[in-house]
Curated annotation (Swiss-Prot):
GO molecular function annotation: toxin activity
Keyword presence, Secreted: yes
Disulfide bonds: 4-15, 8-17
Keywords of the record: Amidation, Disulfide bond, Secreted, Toxin
The organism's place on the tree of life at top rank: Eukaryota
Name of the molecule in the record: U1-poneritoxin-Ae1g
Gene Ontology CC annotation, any one: extracellular region
Modified residues (Glycine amide): 18
Tissue specificity note: Expressed by the venom gland.
Coiled-coil features, chain-numbered ranges: none
Family: Belongs to the poneritoxin-Ae1 family.
Amino acid sequence: GTGCSSGCHRVGQQCRCG
């Protein structure tokens, strides 16, 4: 699906946390 885990944001094709 779309979106990332809570506290994370999309970076290109992946999600990044912190």
